[in-house]
Amino acid sequence: MRLIVGLGNPGQRYARNRHNIGFMAVDEIARVHRAAPFRRRFQGEAAEVMLGSERAILLKPQTFMNESGRSVGEAQRFFKIPLSDVIVLHDELDLAPAKLRVKLGGGNAGHNGLRSITALCGNDYRRVRLGIGHPGDKALVHAYVLNDFAKSEEPWVEDLCRATADHAPLLAAGEDASFQNKVHLAMAGRGWDAVKTPAEAGKAKARDAN
């Protein structure tokens, strides 16, 4: 059994925030693979799903981002899932928009959801890093991640979540390299291989106007 966690903040106020792309991806996995309805469990919302031949629990912690580890730890202990079978989907500032990378363990790169999980559960879980790009200035990061995706970003966000869901059985089977490659090819096929952040797009537009 796998525990697949999407990170985000609960409530409509945060629903389309960049910080919530983990929730969005898990919702799309649930939709594409016809998961059971989400129910309130483990200080979050949880649903069972079959991904290929693998049974998985989808989890969206409702503790707010900084306390995500409480929800993850509760679910992990209940199902006796090894930390190596915990997969966390989260927004990644240090990855270009529309890119995806999978890694095992490593640092938290300032992500409070990952920091909480690492503190309460350990570090050796798998992370699916969903690139949202960086606003260009550290002082802008807080506002950037807690703002909604721009309308111009919505198409690639939807396509990234769909590609993640379509190939989630590979992820559940532990075929991380194949999963990552399939998502990359799907996104490139839709023209998303060189996406700019809104700030980068604005600068490029200004340069073109001069």
Swiss-Prot record:
UniProt-annotated site: Discriminates between blocked and unblocked aminoacyl-tRNA, residues: N9
SUPFAM superfamilies named among the record's database cross-references: Peptidyl-tRNA hydrolase-like
Protein name (record): Peptidyl-tRNA hydrolase
Keywords, sorted A to Z: Cytoplasm, Hydrolase, RNA-binding, tRNA-binding
Organism: Methylorubrum populi (strain ATCC BAA-705 / NCIMB 13946 / BJ001) (Methylobacterium populi)
Lineage: Bacteria, Pseudomonadati, Pseudomonadota, Alphaproteobacteria, Hyphomicrobiales
Site residues by UniProt (Stabilizes the basic form of H active site to accept a proton): D91
One MF term in the entry's GO annotations: tRNA binding
GO cellular component: a single term: cytoplasm
Domain of life: Bacteria
GO biological process assignments: protein quality control for misfolded or incompletely synthesized proteins; rescue of stalled ribosome
Active site, UniProt feature: H19 (proton acceptor)
Localization per Swiss-Prot or TrEMBL: Cytoplasm
Binding site for tRNA: Y14, F64, N66, N112
Family statement drawn from the similarity comment of this UniProt entry: Belongs to the PTH family.
